[in-house]
Amino acid sequence: MIIAIDGPSGAGKSTVSKAVARRLGFSCLDTGAMYRSIAWQALQDGVSLEDGEALGRIADMHEIGFSHEPGDPLPRRVSIAGADVTDAIRTAEIDRSVSAVAAAPAVRQALVAQQQRIGRAGNYVVEGRDIGTAVFPEAELKVFLTASAAERAHRRVAQNERRGVGSTDYAEVLADIERRDAIDSSRDTSPLKPAPDAVQMDSTGRTIEQIIERICALAQEKGMHV
C-alpha cells in the first residue's frame, strides 16, 4: 500500500511522513533526499547543474541507499557511491542546487524507476513533489500538503537551527523557497501540482500533530494499516 504525500519545500512533508509511517507501521521514502544526493554527487564531480544529460548519467550510475539507525524502524541515513550524505545534502548549497537537478528529465526518469522499485516492495509513505501524479498515480491515499511561503520559511529556519546545517537567515530561506516554488511548479517534466484525487491540506496556522492525525484517520478509513 502507498500513501503519497506531495507538496512544496518546507510544507512539513518529512516530519508528517515519518510520523504517519511510524503510527501505521509503514516504512517511509524521502524522494527529495534522492534528488539532493544526485545534486551533491554532481557538485563533487564538477558536473554543471545545467547539463541535464550528465546529471541523468549520474542518476543512472548510482543507486541511492537508505539505512536504519539502531532501534529506529524508519530509514534515516542516506548514501550515494558509498558515501554517507545524510547531513551533506541538507546544506544551503544543496538547497540552491536541487531544483535544477530535479527539473532534468533524465534524472527524474532514473530516480522514478528507483522509487517505484522501493515502494512496490512493501507498505510505504512516500513524500516528494510528484508522487501522486507521476511516481505512484495508483496510490491508495494521496495528500497534497502546503503552507504559506512565510510559514514554510520559519519552519525551515527552525529545522536548520536544530540540525546545525543549512541557512538560518530568514530572508535568505524565504527567497530560496519562493525561487524553488517557481521552478518546481513550472518545469516541463512532472511539475509540482496536486493529483486530481489528492486531499489538499493547508497547514498554515495548524499544528503538525493535527495534520498527522488527519492523514492517519484518512488512511484508517481506507483500511490502510499493518
Residue ranges and their predicted role:
Residues I3-I5:
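Hydrophobic anchor at the beta1->P-loop junction of P-loop NTPases
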Residues T86-R162:
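ATP-dependent NMP and nucleoside kinases share a basic, alpha-helical "lid"
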Residues K13:
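Conserved lysine of the Walker
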Residues S9:
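The conserved Walker
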Residues V16:
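Hydrophobic positions on the alpha1 helix immediately C-terminal to the Walker A/P-loop
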Residues A149-V157, E161, Y170, L174, ...:
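An amphipathic alpha-helix signature
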